[in-house]
Amino acid sequence: MLKMSVTPMMEQYLKIKEKYKDAILFFRLGDFYEMFYEDAEIAAKELEIALTGRDAGTEERAPMAGVPYHAADFYIDKLVKKGYKVAICEQLEDPSKAKGLVKRDVVRIYTPGTIINPESMDEKSNNYLVSVYREKDNYGICAVDVTTGELYATEIKNCKNGKRIYDEIAKYSPSEIISNEEFLKNNKYIKVFKNNNCAVNAYKPLNYEASSELIEKQFDKKVEELELEDKKFVIHSLGALLSYLKELQKTSLKHINKLTLYQDNSYMGLDSNAIRNLEILESNRNKSKKGSLLGVLDRTVTPMGGRLLKKWLEEPLIDKDEIEKRLDAVEELFNNYRERIELKELLNKVYDLERLASKIVYQSVTPKDFISIKLSLQNLPKIKNILSKFSSRLLKEIYEKLDVLQDVYELIDKSIKDDPSNQLKEGNIIKDGYNEMVDKLRKASTEGKNWIANLEADEREKTGIKNLRIGYNKVFGYYIEVTKSNIPQVPDRYIRKQTLANAERYVTPELKEIEETILGAEEKLIELEYELFNEIREKVELQIVRIQNTAKYIAIIDVLISFAEVAETNKYVKPIVDYEDRIVIKEGRHPVVETISDEGFVANDIDIGPENPIMIITGPNMAGKSTYMRQVALIVLMAQVGCFVPASYARIGIVDKIFTRVGASDDIFAGQSTFMVEMSEVANILHSATSKSLIILDEVGRGTSTYDGMSIAQAVIEYIHEKIKAKTLFATHYHELTKLEGKLRGVRNFNVSVEEREDDIIFLHKIVPGGSDRSYGIQVSKLAGLPYSIIERAKEILEALERDKAVKNELEEAVSQFAFTQIDIFSSAKDALIEEIANCDPDNMTPLQALTYLYKLKEKAASLRSGVI
């Protein structure tokens, strides 16, 4: 920056700015945060505020832009959301008491993953900062929400599948990612995160020893106690995360006190494709909660409950006992309507305890925040009392562990006014009776104001000036104001202080004496209230872990009540869950479609198990194949989340992962062909699925030529059948694949029934056994509104193609048999030829018959070799 002579204040600014070159520096000057030079120019443009100048002791004025300190959060959030880092430089001493230049320094730095203002974010969404450490094909991944204190960590070793790492990070929808350089090199997924408004920055990790020391200090436990002794890559990732936060937050991180360590198989596996294709968190159409599974299930009334519900949907359980604990709790709440309603009404009065707790640690909590905490805690004894009536394991456990925080409630209740000022330096915070000195100073201040009122009345009477008034401002203090028309009546004892356009302001010795008494008391009172408030904050801060635990249990109750309420409203049933390799659903419905459909939803069954793990589903477009497959996946997911399901009966064999290849993809593979994207996704499924997985495949192979696509589709089915043995729903337009039912033991055909009426069709949306041999493409096109002339021309072309059915059938048979020759075990033509040779009886043939038979066999063998039967 500038090297020439500058003013002392500007010199101070430049020294601080030198340390934070990559941040926009908010420099506190009185009641404003000022920005200078390039920062000012950026701020003026991005915040749409005036760009002015300030004398800096140089020839040219320094460009300057500023925002009021009391509105700073709004402007900080705006800059951070645009990707800027913002450093807050505060005055570290009272300017009125400073000797010389006021001391200033940076007290906090904000980035997208470290903003702490709850008003700037969706209350039912987390704001995650993710730290990634990579060493060859080994990864340590940590995610933290600094506004709630939640911290998660996992380690993935020997992973060459970049998509798997992407999915693990993407499930947090991070606002910011920090990582070592090795992770950033040649990583095509980094662009995807950046395109989704996620800041991605390199951060040099600490060495192993320094990371371990930082972790142990943060959690006050040894690495072994945290079960990290064999988690080298997590230690590097977590060490970097904590180091980064301490650099930025410059305060204690007491609210980050629990590390949740998990493996990537701790929950049902849901990759980003499954979450998107099943529209679990948001609708693909409008990118909002409405139209998603979350939108249907979310009846939560607390911010904590809303956030927990999202997490549960992203991480369905795979432990039968844990699932049943949730289901039993939902059932008990479902059956006890009155208690459920009472609980919900009480929960509705609970504020965001998690984020309020974080504000206490960050010293950004306000007096009104404490009242929000008090009002929340006030309801806890009533909540606990209702919980005492329940007997299900989970609700009983919550009842036993729920801390009503009576001591915290009593402290706030006796110390903080019921309607306090929200500004710490304005007083009116501490309740009467809490502190003797506060009471004395407040009385002096109040009596002083009474003296002012009495003095005003006396002066009006003595002078005869009826509109005389006594006022106050911060510059001149107390004054007597007289309008110009009444100046002749002003007595000599009045001392002129200020001239206005229509009035004069005066003081008197008596007024100055009262002023000193009042202002002295008020100043001392404000300082004392501020000190006491900080003492109260520190006392409550010691109970942060207890507050967080209570918030966690409140969130669980909220989600369980939400599940019970939705189950009642939408007529869901309690599913049976077990470890059997079977899924049975009777009269299943799509949980989202049934709520938005104007027509009655057609329910469908499924019974899929070891003897029939693969369903090939045929039928026309728009008939409901995709809806059916998605509803099966969603019902399984809901059951494993611990929610009742839309069906008349459901028995769910727990699945370890759900995979989907449905419809268009997102921009992960931007620049690649549709077919390449499809094949990449299918390959990922085939590499990752197990016999306990549920696979949903829709129109695999459609992105290439008919024969290529059909061959690929069949090969995929064969591979799943022989190698993976996963439960699979496979929708296709390749009717030739229905012949696999007779070739592969575990394949069964189903189709979506339609009713034909002359040239029209009616979709019955019913899944029935058997394959379909027609696509009804022309009829569907007619329903879709294609012009009449095109429909008629399409009919003519179709009739021409169907005229020589013998040729058509021969071609189809040839293609089909060609496909079956690819794997010996499925070569029915070859098997038939071998069977024919084995069964022939040459002893009973004449020489001519034997020769004729031999030529016939030779012709069949030649046809087999050429691939045409």
Swiss-Prot record:
Top-rank lineage group of the source organism: Bacteria
Q: Which GO MF terms are attached to this record?
A: ATP binding; ATP-dependent DNA damage sensor activity; damaged DNA binding; mismatched DNA binding
Residue positions annotated to bind ATP are: 619-626
Stretches of the chain forming a coiled coil according to its record: none
Listed GO CC annotations: cytosol
Q: What SMART domains does its record include?
A: MUTSac, MUTSd
Q: Name one GO biological process term.
A: mismatch repair
The UniProt keyword set, sorted, is: ATP-binding, DNA damage, DNA repair, DNA-binding, Nucleotide-binding
Its function, per the record, reads:
This protein is involved in the repair of mismatches in DNA. It is possible that it carries out the mismatch recognition step. This protein has a weak ATPase activity.
Q: Which family does it belong to?
A: Belongs to the DNA mismatch repair MutS family.
Protein name listed in UniProt: DNA mismatch repair protein MutS
Q: What is the lineage of its organism?
A: Bacteria, Bacillati, Bacillota, Clostridia, Thermoanaerobacterales
Identify the coding gene: mutS
